[in-house]
């Protein structure tokens, strides 16, 4: 009610001073804060009928068209990026992000902001480089203001985003460095003060290790000492170990870790979140992924694939978040193991959905031009001797592979055999 009241109170002020860029920014932000994180029904690709997204968009697009100085207004640029990121057309804010990146060079959050759009448009190199630049700016601010303040969450956010971009690029070194720096920004003291906010960031490392098939390193991961504090981390480490042991052919150890995961999951409170999603909801995806790979690797391939399909369903129904709470798209594992059993037809559908080629997924759920899904789709198209799509996909794949620092042989390193190199 307070957000509605403020928006209503600002409207006549905006109408009287409709050429004042600062007041326009305040009014637009008030409109957007009526339904934060719910500006759009992104599953349907339409504005939230209970919100004011269309009014905010009309005002902002008009002001950028009518007032050249609007392109130098950090607040207006910032608002437009947030407005469009859940929309069906995030690319409309690309130019706004490009300008904002350099406009306030000493504000790390604003240096980072463009990557909310970059990631949705498949520009993962910008996602990585701009967030690393923002992190450097953050370090300067930390020297000035100290580490224990509200801005700590923004420092973490930038490094989390850098990790996410590196994973999509296939840049193992950058992903490992980002997740290491991320952990350093979340000391035990901070987690103890705000466990429901900060603890889930500590659990990022297992995702990176799985993305790059670091099975031996995963089996050597230690469970957190304080399992009551690090409840999400404890569960995710067991998940990662179950997946790792399954891929190493150690099926008894994998099943044991799967049981330990179930016990750990039971202790995760409903209050624990990763931004807009409950930890328990995110860990449900981990459970299906884990059961899928454990079953598949032990020879129960049909059962395993069904679990992975369920993981995809859960992944698709997470609340919007940037970056997404589940950093390795579930379709990458499903597609890889479908190819392993020779189901090229379903795998092609899986990869096209992930890349956004067929438009079946909501726009914010698509991962355009990512090297992993491009590799899988290229294999599918080559297998059926496609002559139309294959050259285009091959061109995109060559560009994406040129930026990875590892050889990409499959969309997920859980794939144990490949007829394709």
Annotate the PLM regions.
Residues 2, 19-22, 26, 52, ...:
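Structural signature of alpha-solenoid helical repeat junctions
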Residues 14-16, 64-69, 98-106, 136-137, ...:
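Solenoid-like repeat scaffolds
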Residues 26, 79, 113, 120, ...:
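"A position-specific structural signal for the A-helix of alpha-solenoid helical repeats
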Residues 31, 83-84, 118, 166, ...:
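Residue at a conserved register position within TPR or TPR-like alpha-solenoid repeats
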Residues 119, 128-139, 166-184, 255-266, ...:
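TPR/TPR-like (Sel1-like) alpha-helical repeat modules
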